[in-house]
């Protein structure tokens, strides 16, 4: 629903939320570094403890698309594993900070993980024409006080996403009740680290491939004899 929020009236709850946010002082957002040349994919990962899977996803995306840089914003202190992955803090919800963040990074696509919505930041990205996708959406990511007492805020904000991928059946059921029916919602598995291929000598790989000759190989790992 790319333009849905722009064409539909905003709920009273969302208007009230945005008015309250404007009363706070901006934090004067300062980016962690200059924007790199080329395309930038922004991943926001508010859930803690999933850094390995997050970095694995970012590395795979960079490997598949030449010149791509991945910007990761998170609620925990992360250290970038390589030059193409950029770590930064997400801006506050004040309009001045969200504007500074988006004008600096100019993301080509945004991938929001888990939940814990930042309505002003998501709305600002949507209105700038940034394609938004939510993946690995978890039930706990939509269980804070605002979602319970002002479900219309989440309903308006979720309309900004083109696709929403839930990690579990309970999360899918929760989002189905929370979201508008015209937003794409699918059930997928959780985001997990898949592991990256280790460096190897091409000559060794060629020799092993020739020896195997296409025969199936059975690998038994971490097993013990009885």
Regions of interest found by a model, annotated:
Residues 1-37:
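Positively charged, low-complexity intrinsically disordered leader regions
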Residues 5-12, 171, 201-204:
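Alpha-helical structural motif
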Residues 27-31, 197-213:
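A short helix/loop element that forms part of the nucleotide-sugar donor recognition site in Leloir-type
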Residues 28-29, 39-195, 200, 224:
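Active-site and donor-binding regions of nucleotide-sugar-utilizing enzymes
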Residues 41-45, 209-225:
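Conserved donor-binding/catalytic core segment of Leloir-type glycosyltransferases
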């Amino acid at each position: 629903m790319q333009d849905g929020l722009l064409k539909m009236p905003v709920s009273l709850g969302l208007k009230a939320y945005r008015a309250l946010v404007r009363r706070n002082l901006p934090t004067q957002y300062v980016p962690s570094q200059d924007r790199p040349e080329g395309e930038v994919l922004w991943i926001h990962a508010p859930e803690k403890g999933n850094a390995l899977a997050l970095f694995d996803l970012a590395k795979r995306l960079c490997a598949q698309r030449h010149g791509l840089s991945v910007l990761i914003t998170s609620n925990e202190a992360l250290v970038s594993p390589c030059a193409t992955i950029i770590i930064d803090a997400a801006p506050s919800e004040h309009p001045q900070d969200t504007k500074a963040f988006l004008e600096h990074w100019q993301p080509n696509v945004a991938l929001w993980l888990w939940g814990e919505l930042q309505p002003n930041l998501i709305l600002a990205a949507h209105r700038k024409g940034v394609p938004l996708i939510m993946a690995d959406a978890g039930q706990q990511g939509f269980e804070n006080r605002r979602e319970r007492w002002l479900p219309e805020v989440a309903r308006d904000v979720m309309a900004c996403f083109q696709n929403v991928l839930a990690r579990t059946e309970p999360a899918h059921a929760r989002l189905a009740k929370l979201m508008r029916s015209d937003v794409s919602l699918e059930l997928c598995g959780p985001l997990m680290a898949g592991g990256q291929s280790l460096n190897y000598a091409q000559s060794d790989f060629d020799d092993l491939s020739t020896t195997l000759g296409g025969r199936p190989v059975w690998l038994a790992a971490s097993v013990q004899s009885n």
